[in-house]
Amino acid sequence: MSLTPGQFERAAAFEAHQQRLVQLQRMSYRELQQLLTGDPAEAALWVRSAAEYGVPAAQLRLGRMLLEGNGVERDERAAFTWFERAADGGDPEAMNMAGRCHENGWGVPMDFRKAAERYRASAEAGHDWGEYNLGNLLFDGRGVTQDVAAALRWYLRASHRGHGRAMNLAARCFEEGWGCAKSPAEAAEWYRRSAESGYFRAQFNYGVLLAELGDGAAAAEWFSKALSAGDDGVRQAVARVLEGAMDGALVALRGGLAAGRPSGTA
């Protein structure tokens, strides 16, 4: 019996898929990494084969490739489907990504309640982004009953895993007394740790704190680091803080900004 052109193409694709699966099983870790960091379109073929075979990590990666249009045509709906499959397979990062799809309306109608469910599953599995994102929904009361104290607890859990953004928000809670008693010492500690992790908003916040404590030199250093991120909002915020500053280091930084230097320094 002869095959139609369509049947022949499907048979050839299936055979190629099977061959890729066999080769994947024989690859060393180094060979696999070289494959995944090579040509995106070629990598997508291998990732799809592993995803269709049922490997949650591959399903997650394929979802990301589809969401970003990396090596494949961008398809938010297909990305969400693969995130869901990986999440159902127990992958905490995929649970978080499925939550992001629900929260942002990527490939699926926006639904904060479903986002919270996925974030909670991810958070309870110990994923830092799941903890952070669940904290945000709890803080704002989106999809869940607002609970700022619970939000802070999740921020702290993510912070202890090294999540820079969570550290910054935990610091803000301690600074303002949101969901906890005010604690300048805790706020300073978490702003510092977040700033040292490289998060530019925390670098600005820590700089403000240091300026208020009278350490203009250290404040100027952190402001300069924050400015290096190139965020217009932070640049405007730094400029406002520097208005009327008398400390020599802060005055010099203000002059650098006025001269158009991106980080305020030479």
Q: What are the language-model segments listed below?
A:
Residues L24, D39, E52-V55, E68-N70, ...:
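Short helix-capping/linker turns of helical repeat alpha-solenoids
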Residues M1-L21:
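Long, contiguous interaction/recruitment modules in multidomain scaffold/adaptor proteins
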Residues P5-G6, L227-A266:
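Terminal, low-structured helical/coil segments at or just beyond the last alpha-helical repeat
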Residues R161-A237:
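Ankyrin-repeat and related helical/solenoid repeat scaffolds used for protein-protein interactions
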Residues S28-L35, R61-E68, M95, G99-N104, ...:
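Hydrophobic face of amphipathic alpha-helices that form TPR/SEL1-like repeat modules
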